Curated annotation (Swiss-Prot):
GO biological process: L-tryptophan biosynthetic process
Pathway this chain belongs to: Amino-acid biosynthesis; L-tryptophan biosynthesis; L-tryptophan from chorismate: step 4/5
Pfam families (UniProt xref): IGPS
Name assigned to this protein: Indole-3-glycerol phosphate synthase
Species name: Aromatoleum aromaticum (strain DSM 19018 / LMG 30748 / EbN1)
Length: 262
């Protein structure tokens, strides 16, 4: 499974090349202008933390390159409603088709079924995808430091800001985190999964915490599978979590959320 990320990014560049011809930027912008304002993604996370609760970005994910199909019975609208009832702060929905068996339609269905803000979880390589994300209804986008240079991330953060969207910037090591912190977004994701090997270690978040200045919200991502994992993070003042697989493997993902974070 060597360098999955490079394979994914190559496909993404091809998707953007084709997509931006089929739907030119002017067309996507017009679609965006017809939409209501985005839901407040950062505000939803801050409200949970202010109340003393864990802020959970609950992920809707059918499959992954490392695990294959995770959930056969995959109904995004139903899962979104279960997550909302389970106490999620926000949703994350995979829209990548080739590697994660996601789709924009899944994001649209999930968002329509609930009142939670929704992150488009995909591999963004071009500002066109930020407009595309808003056009499909996303309230936030993910920017991955391992996939982008700083100038590109700043451009995409500016586009997201102009559309009223939040940005979650994701890093995996100290060098990436130093780049991530040059963006203005308050949401700093630390991915415990190495996107080049897909190996997971919760120590990644703990090792990087001290580098994150006050005022930023650390979102720990990947590998949160048991209440002990949650307790470890909260004992270290990490109160925001992006969790998918642990919930996708139980019949009612909302109940899974409650049992993991209750």
């Amino acid at each position: 499974m060597s360098d999955i990320l490079d394979k994914i990014l190559s496909v993404k560049r091809d998707e953007v090349a084709a997509g931006s011809v089929a739907r030119p930027l002017a067309q996507v912008r017009a679609e965006v202008e017809a939409l209501a304002a985005p839901r407040n993604f950062v505000g939803a996370i801050r409200a949970k933390i202010a109340a003393g609760d864990a802020a959970v970005i609950a992920e809707i994910k059918k499959a992954s390159p490392s695990k294959g199909v995770i959930r056969e019975d995959f109904r995004p609208a139903e899962i979104a409603l279960q997550y909302e009832r389970g106490g999620a702060a926000c949703l994350s929905v995979l829209t990548d088709r080739q590697f994660f068996q996601g789709a924009p339609a899944y994001l649209q269905a999930a968002r329509a079924a609930c009142s939670l803000p929704v992150l488009r979880k995909d591999f963004l390589v071009d500002p066109w995808q930020v407009y595309e994300a808003r056009a499909m209804g996303a309230d936030a986008v993910l920017l991955i430091v391992a996939a982008l240079d700083l100038a590109a991330m700043r451009d995409m953060e500016a586009v997201a800001g102009s559309l009223g969207m939040a940005v979650l910037v994701e890093a995996h090591d100290a060098a990436e985190l130093d780049v991530a912190l040059q963006l203005s977004t308050p949401l700093v994701g630390i991915n415990n999964r190495n996107l080049r090997t897909f190996d997971v270690s919760l120590q990644t978040t703990l090792d990087l915490l001290a580098r994150v200045p006050a005022g930023r919200i650390v979102v720990t991502e990947s590998g949160i599978l048991a209440p002990a994992d949650v307790a470890l993070m909260r004992a270290n003042a990490v109160n925001a979590f992006l969790v998918g697989e642990a919930f996708m493997r139980v019949p009612d993902p909302g109940e899974g959320l409650r049992s993991l974070f209750g």
